[in-house]
C-alpha cells in the first residue's frame, strides 16, 4: 500500500472511531446509571454530559464521566493499535514486479505541468502540456515520419525561452518559428553554408583561435582533432600526419597575418579561414613539395610552424602525397564558393549563446547532408568546446541556458566532444535534446558502451512506437514488469477455483509497436513509473498556431 493511502485510511478510521466513541459512551452511561437501555439514542451521551452542571445530576457526574472515558478510550485504543500496525507493516512485494504508469498527480508533484523559460516540452497529459525544467537532458527515439517535428521540435522552438541552436534539415523550422523567436527579443541567425539562394549568416571556425602565440597551437590542435578524429589503429599514422599538416598550414596563415599587421601592410590577407587553408595547401601549380619548402623558409615563421613543415616535407614522395590526400579530404568541400564565403567571417559568435538570448538555425538541404556532415560536426564540436571552459557561477555574464536541439542526431556522425562531455555539460548550462530514429542507430554511430553512457546522462527518454523488433523488445524491458493474478478453474468431482501470480510486461513489444501515431511513452529519472501520454500536434493547438509568424529575413552572400 502506498504511504498516502495508509494515511488516508487512518484518517477515515479515526473519524469513524470518534463517532463510535460518542455513541458507545451514551450506551455505557445508561448501563452505569442502572437505567433502561431502551432509552438509548445516538446522542444520549451529549444529553447527559450537557446536564452535568445541574444540581440533581451532581451525584452521578462520576459515572457519566467514566462512561465517556470508557466509551471513547476503548475505540481509541483499538485505533492506536491498528494505526501502528498499518504504519509499521512492510509492503508485500509482488512476486514479479509492481510496474505501473504514472498518473497526472505524479507529474504534478514533480512540477511537470509548470512553464518556465527553460522548460522543454515533452508531451501532453490530460490536455495539459508536460514539461521538463532545469538543466537535465532529453532524448527522443522516433522512427522517420512519426511526428517528431510536429510533436517536439516545433513546439519547443515556439516555447523555449532562452538560447537555442537547432539542426534544421530542410529549413522548415526556420520558416515556421524564426518570426516568433525574433518577436521575443531573440537574435536570429541562419547558417546554411550550401544555400542555393545564397542566403546565410557567416561563421568562421578559425576566428576563435587565440591571437596569443602561447595559446594558438592548443586552439589549432583542438580544431585539428575535430577535423581529423581518431580512427582505427592502422589509421593512427595518417591521422597524426594530417593533423601535423593542418598545423603547418594554419600556423603559416596566422603568422603571416601577424607579420602583415605588425608591419602595417594595408589590407593584407585578413583572418585565416578554412578556405584559405585549402587554397594554400593546393599550391600555385608548380611542384608542390618545392612550393611548400619555400613557404617553410619564410622569415616570420615560428619554430612550431617550421617543425610542422619539416615533419611533412621529410616524408618520401609517395607518403607525402598520401598525407596531403588525407589532410585535404575534409577540406575538399571548400572548393564551393558559397561554403567558402559562408565561413569567411562572423555574423554571430558561438561564445555569446550564454550571454544573450539568440537562436541559430543550421539549415541544410537533405541532398547536401553528406557533404555538410563534417562542417556541422565541427560547428557543434566548437560550440560545446568553447562553452565548457567557464562555469556560469564564475561569470555572471553567462546568465542564459543554451539548448542544442539536434534533429537527425546521428546524421552528422560521431561528435567526439559529446561522447566525452555529456556527463558535465549541464553544469555549464549547455543542454541537449538529440533526436534519433532508434537506440540501435545510436549504437551504430557511437558504439554500444558510449551510446549507453549518452542515454544514461539523459534524464528523460521519450519513446515513440518503434518499428524494429529489437527496439520494441528493449523498450518493453525498460518499462518493467507487473504481477497479474490469473484465475484457474478445474473440473473434477467438484468445481474448484485457484489463483496464480504471473509476470507480465507493463507493455508487451507488440503493444509498443501498436501504440499508434498519437501516443508516446517517456521515462524520467525523477518519477519511478513510466509515463504514457499524448503526442503534441502543434497545428491542432491554438497555443502554438497563434505563434506562427512570418520568417526573419536573411542577408544574401556576395558571391
Can you name each region flagged by the protein language model?
Residues 422-424, 428-521:
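Conserved ATP-driven motor cores of ASCE-family P-loop NTPases powering translocation/secretion/packaging/pilus
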Residues 41-42, 263, 344, 396, ...:
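Flexible domain-boundary/linker segments
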Residues 52-57, 355, 453-454, 499, ...:
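Short alpha-helix boundary/capping motifs
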Residues 18-30, 34, 88-95, 129-430, ...:
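P-loop NTPase motor domains
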Residues 1-146, 150-153, 205, 481, ...:
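Basic- and hydrophobic-enriched, low-structure N-terminal and domain-boundary segments
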Residues 15, 408, 462:
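Short, flexible active-site loop motifs that bind/organize anionic cofactors or intermediates
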Residues 120-125, 344, 444-445:
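Short gly/ser/thr-rich secondary-structure transition/capping motifs
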Amino acid at each position: 500500500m502506498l504511504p498516502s493511502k495508509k494515511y488516508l485510511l487512518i484518517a477515515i478510521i479515526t473519524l469513524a472511531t470518534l463517532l463510535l466513541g460518542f455513541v458507545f459512551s451514551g450506551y455505557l452511561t445508561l448501563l452505569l446509571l442502572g437505567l433502561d437501555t431502551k432509552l438509548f439514542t445516538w446522542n444520549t451521551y451529549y444529553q447527559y454530559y450537557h446536564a452535568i452542571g445541574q444540581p440533581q445530576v451532581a451525584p452521578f457526574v462520576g459515572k457519566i464521566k467514566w462512561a465517556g472515558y470508557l466509551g471513547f478510550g476503548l475505540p481509541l485504543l483499538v485505533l492506536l493499535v491498528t494505526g501502528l500496525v498499518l504504519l509499521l507493516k512492510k509492503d508485500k512485494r509482488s512476486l514479479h514486479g509492481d510496474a505501473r504508469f504514472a498518473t497526472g498527480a505524479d507529474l504534478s508533484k514533480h512540477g511537470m505541468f509548470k512553464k518556465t523559460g527553460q522548460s522543454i516540452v515533452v508531451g501532453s497529459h490530460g490536455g495539459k502540456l508536460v514539461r521538463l525544467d532545469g538543466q537535465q537532458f532529453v532524448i527522443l527515439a522516433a522512427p522517420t515520419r512519426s511526428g517528431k517535428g510536429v510533436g517536439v521540435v516545433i513546439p519547443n522552438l515556439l516555447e523555449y525561452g532562452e538560447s537555442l541552436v537547432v539542426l534544421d534539415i530542410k529549413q522548415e523550422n526556420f520558416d515556421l518559428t524564426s518570426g516568433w523567436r525574433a518577436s521575443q527579443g531573440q537574435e536570429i541567425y541562419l547558417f546554411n553554408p550550401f544555400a542555393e539562394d545564397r542566403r546565410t549568416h557567416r561563421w568562421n571556425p578559425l576566428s576563435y583561435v587565440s591571437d596569443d602565440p602561447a595559446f594558438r597551437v592548443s586552439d589549432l590542435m583542438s580544431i585539428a582533432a575535430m577535423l581529423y578524429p581518431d580512427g582505427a589503429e592502422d589509421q593512427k599514422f595518417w591521422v597524426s600526419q594530417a593533423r601535423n599538416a593542418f598545423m603547418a598550414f594554419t600556423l603559416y596563415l596566422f603568422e603571416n597575418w601577424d607579420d602583415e599587421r605588425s608591419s602595417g601592410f594595408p589590407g593584407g590577407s585578413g583572418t585565416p579561414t578554412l578556405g584559405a587553408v585549402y587554397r594554400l595547401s593546393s599550391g600555385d601549380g608548380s611542384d608542390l613539395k618545392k612550393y611548400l619548402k619555400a613557404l617553410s623558409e619564410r622569415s616570420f615563421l615560428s619554430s612550431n610552424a617550421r617543425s610542422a613543415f619539416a615533419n611533412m616535407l621529410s616524408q618520401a614522395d609517395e607518403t607525402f602525397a598520401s598525407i596531403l590526400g588525407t589532410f585535404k579530404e575534409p577540406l575538399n568541400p571548400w572548393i564551393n564558393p558559397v561554403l567558402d564565403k559562408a565561413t569567411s567571417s562572423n555574423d554571430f559568435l558561438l561564445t555569446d549563446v550564454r550571454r544573450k538570448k539568440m537562436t541559430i538555425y543550421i539549415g541544410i538541404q537533405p541532398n547536401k547532408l553528406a557533404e555538410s556532415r563534417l562542417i556541422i560536426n565541427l560547428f557543434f564540436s566548437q560550440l560545446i568546446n568553447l562553452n565548457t571552459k567557464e562555469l556560469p557561477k564564475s561569470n555572471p555574464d553567462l546568465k542564459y541556458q543554451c539548448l542544442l536541439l539536434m534533429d537527425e542526431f546521428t546524421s552528422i556522425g560521431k561528435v567526439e566532444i559529446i561522447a566525452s562531455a555529456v556527463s558535465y555539460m549541464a553544469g555549464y548550462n549547455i543542454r541537449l535534446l538529440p533526436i534519433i530514429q532508434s537506440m540501435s542507430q545510436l549504437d551504430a554511430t557511437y558504439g554500444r558502451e558510449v551510446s549507453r553512457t549518452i542515454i544514461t546522462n539523459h534524464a528523460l527518454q521519450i519513446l515513440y512506437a518503434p518499428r524494429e523488433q529489437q527496439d520494441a523488445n528493449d523498450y518493453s524491458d525498460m518499462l518493467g514488469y507487473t504481477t497479474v493474478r490469473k484465475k484457474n478453474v478445474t473440473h473434477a468431482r467438484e468445481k474448484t477455483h485457484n489463483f496464480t501470480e504471473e509476470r507480465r510486461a507493463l507493455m508487451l513489444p507488440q503493444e509498443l509497436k501498436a501504440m499508434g501515431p498519437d501516443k508516446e511513452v517517456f521515462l524520467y529519472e525523477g518519477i519511478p513509473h513510466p509515463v504514457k501520454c499524448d503526442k503534441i500536434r502543434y497545428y491542432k493547438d491554438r497555443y502554438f498556431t497563434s505563434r506562427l509568424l512570418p520568417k526573419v529575413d536573411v542577408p544574401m552572400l556576395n558571391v
